[in-house]
Regions:
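Acidic/polar residues in short coil/turn loops that connect beta-strands
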Residues: 67-68, 85
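Gly/Ser/Thr-rich beta-alpha loop segments that engage phosphate groups in nucleotides
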Residues: 42, 68, 77
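Aspartic protease core domain of the pepsin/retropepsin superfamily
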Residues: 73-76, 80-167
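Short, conserved interaction/coordination micro-motifs, predominantly
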Residues: 6-25, 30-34, 141-167
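General beta-strand structural signal in soluble alpha/beta enzymes
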Residues: 64-65, 119
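Short active-site-adjacent helix-start/loop capping segments
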Residues: 44-45, 72-74
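Aspartyl protease active-site motif detector
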Residues: 14-64, 90-106, 145
Length: 167
Protein backbone atom coordinates (compact mmCIF):
# COMPACT_ATOMS: atom_id res chain seq x y z
CA UNK A 1 0.00 0.00 0.00
CA UNK A 2 1.23 3.47 -0.86
CA UNK A 3 0.84 5.93 2.01
CA UNK A 4 1.37 9.63 1.49
CA UNK A 5 1.24 12.38 4.06
CA UNK A 6 1.68 15.25 1.63
CA UNK A 7 -1.08 17.56 0.42
CA UNK A 8 -2.51 17.83 3.90
CA UNK A 9 -6.14 18.80 4.12
CA UNK A 10 -8.64 19.24 6.90
CA UNK A 11 -12.16 18.18 5.97
CA UNK A 12 -15.41 18.27 7.87
CA UNK A 13 -18.17 16.19 6.33
CA UNK A 14 -21.83 15.87 7.20
CA UNK A 15 -23.50 12.58 6.23
CA UNK A 16 -27.08 13.09 7.43
CA UNK A 17 -28.43 9.98 5.71
CA UNK A 18 -25.68 7.62 6.87
CA UNK A 19 -25.64 5.98 10.29
CA UNK A 20 -22.41 5.02 12.02
CA UNK A 21 -23.93 1.84 13.42
CA UNK A 22 -26.06 -0.66 11.51
CA UNK A 23 -29.11 -2.50 12.75
CA UNK A 24 -28.56 -6.10 13.88
CA UNK A 25 -30.12 -7.40 10.65
CA UNK A 26 -27.83 -5.21 8.53
CA UNK A 27 -24.73 -6.22 10.55
CA UNK A 28 -25.37 -9.85 9.64
CA UNK A 29 -25.47 -8.94 5.94
CA UNK A 30 -22.20 -6.97 5.96
CA UNK A 31 -18.80 -8.62 5.60
CA UNK A 32 -15.27 -7.42 4.88
CA UNK A 33 -15.71 -7.64 1.09
CA UNK A 34 -19.26 -6.31 1.08
CA UNK A 35 -19.91 -2.72 0.06
CA UNK A 36 -23.20 -0.86 0.41
CA UNK A 37 -24.18 1.04 -2.74
CA UNK A 38 -25.77 4.01 -1.03
CA UNK A 39 -28.03 6.63 -2.63
CA UNK A 40 -27.95 8.76 0.53
CA UNK A 41 -24.21 8.90 1.20
CA UNK A 42 -22.35 11.91 -0.16
CA UNK A 43 -18.90 10.27 -0.05
CA UNK A 44 -17.22 6.88 -0.46
CA UNK A 45 -16.12 5.65 2.99
CA UNK A 46 -14.62 2.64 4.72
CA UNK A 47 -13.36 1.71 8.15
CA UNK A 48 -10.89 -0.83 6.79
CA UNK A 49 -7.37 0.52 6.26
CA UNK A 50 -6.25 -2.70 4.58
CA UNK A 51 -8.43 -2.12 1.48
CA UNK A 52 -6.47 0.92 0.29
CA UNK A 53 -4.05 0.68 -2.62
CA UNK A 54 -3.12 4.32 -1.94
CA UNK A 55 -3.87 6.32 1.20
CA UNK A 56 -3.06 9.97 1.91
CA UNK A 57 -2.93 10.19 5.70
CA UNK A 58 -2.48 13.95 5.43
CA UNK A 59 -6.22 14.27 4.90
CA UNK A 60 -7.85 14.51 8.32
CA UNK A 61 -10.97 15.94 9.88
CA UNK A 62 -14.35 14.77 11.08
CA UNK A 63 -17.58 13.40 9.74
CA UNK A 64 -20.97 13.84 11.39
CA UNK A 65 -23.42 11.01 10.79
CA UNK A 66 -27.21 10.97 10.81
CA UNK A 67 -27.34 9.62 14.36
CA UNK A 68 -25.44 12.71 15.60
CA UNK A 69 -22.13 10.94 16.16
CA UNK A 70 -18.96 12.76 15.09
CA UNK A 71 -15.87 10.66 14.32
CA UNK A 72 -12.39 11.20 12.94
CA UNK A 73 -11.33 10.97 9.31
CA UNK A 74 -7.79 9.60 9.08
CA UNK A 75 -7.11 9.67 5.35
CA UNK A 76 -8.41 9.62 1.82
CA UNK A 77 -7.34 7.35 -0.98
CA UNK A 78 -7.95 4.79 -3.68
CA UNK A 79 -9.31 1.25 -3.44
CA UNK A 80 -8.48 -1.20 -6.22
CA UNK A 81 -11.04 -3.88 -7.06
CA UNK A 82 -10.51 -7.12 -8.99
CA UNK A 83 -13.31 -7.76 -11.48
CA UNK A 84 -14.51 -11.22 -12.47
CA UNK A 85 -12.98 -10.77 -15.95
CA UNK A 86 -9.54 -10.14 -14.44
CA UNK A 87 -9.56 -6.37 -14.91
CA UNK A 88 -8.90 -3.96 -12.05
CA UNK A 89 -11.09 -0.95 -11.31
CA UNK A 90 -10.21 2.04 -9.13
CA UNK A 91 -12.51 3.72 -6.65
CA UNK A 92 -10.98 7.13 -5.96
CA UNK A 93 -11.82 9.59 -3.21
CA UNK A 94 -12.54 7.03 -0.47
CA UNK A 95 -12.37 8.40 3.07
CA UNK A 96 -10.76 6.26 5.77
CA UNK A 97 -12.91 6.45 8.91
CA UNK A 98 -11.64 3.84 11.41
CA UNK A 99 -14.87 3.79 13.47
CA UNK A 100 -17.00 2.92 10.45
CA UNK A 101 -18.16 -0.70 10.36
CA UNK A 102 -19.44 -0.57 6.78
CA UNK A 103 -17.86 -0.04 3.37
CA UNK A 104 -19.89 2.57 1.49
CA UNK A 105 -19.94 3.51 -2.18
CA UNK A 106 -21.72 6.83 -2.72
CA UNK A 107 -23.88 6.52 -5.82
CA UNK A 108 -24.12 10.31 -5.94
CA UNK A 109 -20.33 10.52 -6.09
CA UNK A 110 -20.29 7.85 -8.82
CA UNK A 111 -22.81 9.89 -10.83
CA UNK A 112 -20.70 13.03 -10.30
CA UNK A 113 -17.66 11.16 -11.64
CA UNK A 114 -19.53 10.28 -14.86
CA UNK A 115 -20.77 6.78 -14.05
CA UNK A 116 -24.37 5.88 -14.84
CA UNK A 117 -26.58 4.62 -12.02
CA UNK A 118 -29.91 3.02 -12.94
CA UNK A 119 -32.36 1.71 -10.35
CA UNK A 120 -35.54 0.06 -11.56
CA UNK A 121 -37.82 -2.66 -10.17
CA UNK A 122 -35.46 -3.55 -7.33
CA UNK A 123 -32.38 -3.87 -9.53
CA UNK A 124 -29.47 -1.42 -9.46
CA UNK A 125 -27.24 -1.29 -12.51
CA UNK A 126 -23.94 0.59 -12.45
CA UNK A 127 -22.24 1.51 -15.73
CA UNK A 128 -18.70 2.82 -16.28
CA UNK A 129 -17.71 5.89 -18.30
CA UNK A 130 -17.94 3.89 -21.56
CA UNK A 131 -21.42 2.67 -20.49
CA UNK A 132 -20.24 -0.89 -19.96
CA UNK A 133 -22.14 -2.70 -17.19
CA UNK A 134 -19.99 -2.86 -14.04
CA UNK A 135 -22.52 -4.31 -11.61
CA UNK A 136 -26.08 -5.56 -11.43
CA UNK A 137 -27.34 -5.75 -7.85
CA UNK A 138 -30.70 -6.88 -6.48
CA UNK A 139 -32.24 -4.93 -3.61
CA UNK A 140 -32.01 -6.75 -0.28
CA UNK A 141 -34.91 -7.35 2.11
CA UNK A 142 -33.65 -4.38 4.14
CA UNK A 143 -33.96 -2.21 1.00
CA UNK A 144 -30.20 -1.83 0.64
CA UNK A 145 -27.98 -2.72 -2.30
CA UNK A 146 -25.00 -4.87 -1.27
CA UNK A 147 -22.14 -5.68 -3.62
CA UNK A 148 -19.40 -8.17 -2.80
CA UNK A 149 -16.13 -6.97 -4.31
CA UNK A 150 -12.68 -8.50 -4.19
CA UNK A 151 -9.90 -6.15 -3.22
CA UNK A 152 -6.92 -6.27 -5.59
CA UNK A 153 -3.45 -5.89 -4.16
CA UNK A 154 -1.36 -3.43 -6.13
CA UNK A 155 1.63 -5.07 -7.78
CA UNK A 156 4.95 -3.40 -8.46
CA UNK A 157 6.87 -5.12 -11.23
CA UNK A 158 10.57 -4.48 -11.72
CA UNK A 159 13.14 -5.91 -14.04
CA UNK A 160 16.88 -6.07 -13.53
CA UNK A 161 19.18 -6.43 -16.49
CA UNK A 162 22.65 -7.69 -15.70
CA UNK A 163 25.90 -7.33 -17.60
CA UNK A 164 25.46 -10.63 -19.41
CA UNK A 165 24.69 -9.99 -23.08
CA UNK A 166 22.00 -11.96 -24.88
CA UNK A 167 23.51 -14.47 -27.31
Amino acid sequence: MYIAADAEACVHLVERKVLLHLSEEEKEAVGPHRWVLDTGAMNHMTGSRSVFAELNTGVAGTVKFGDGSVVAIEGKGTVLFACKNGEHRRLDGVYYIPCLTTNIVSLGQMDEDGFKVDIESGILRLYDLQRQLLAKVHRSASRLYFLDMNIAAPVCLTMHVGDVAWR
